Amino acid sequence: MKMANSLRGEVLKLYKNLLYLGRDYPKGADYFKKRLKNIFLKNKDVKNPEKIKELIAQGEFVMKELEALYFLRKYRAMKQRYYSDTNKTN
C-alpha cells in the first residue's frame, strides 16, 4: 500500500508538471489539457507498480520533449530577432 501511495504522488506530480508545460503548447492549452486528461484517465486502472513506473518514465520523456520544443521555439525567435538584420545586409 505504501508503494501505491508513493507512486500516486509521482503520478500527480507528473500530471501537474505536464499541465503546467501545456500552457504554451502550439495547438493551445485547452487542446493539450483534454489530451492529457484522456491519457491519464485511460491508464487510471493500472495497478501493477512496474507498469506504473514505465508509464511515469514515458510521461517524463514527453515532458523533456516538450521542454526541448519550447527551448527551440524560443531560440528560433531570438535568432530571428537578433540576426535577421545581419542576414539582410549580406
UniProtKB/Swiss-Prot annotation:
Pfam families: Complex1_LYR (PF05347). CDD domains: Complex1_LYR_ETFRF1_LYRM5. It is found in: Mitochondrion. One of its GO terms (cellular component) is mitochondrion. Transmembrane segments: none annotated. One of its GO terms (molecular function) is enzyme inhibitor activity. GO terms for biological process: negative regulation of oxidative phosphorylation; respiratory electron transport chain. InterPro entries: Complex1_LYR_dom, Complex1_LYR_ETFRF1_LYRM5, ETFRF1. Its main location: mitochondrion. The keyword Mitochondrion applies. Keywords: Mitochondrion. Acts as a regulator of the electron transfer flavoprotein by promoting the removal of flavin from the ETF holoenzyme (composed of ETFA and ETFB). Belongs to the complex I LYR family. PANTHER family: ELECTRON TRANSFER FLAVOPROTEIN REGULATORY FACTOR 1, GROWTH HORMONE-INDUCIBLE SOLUBLE PROTEIN-RELATED. homotetramer. Interacts with NDUFAB1. Interacts with ETFA. Interacts with ETFB. This is Electron transfer flavoprotein regulatory factor 1. It comes from Homo sapiens.
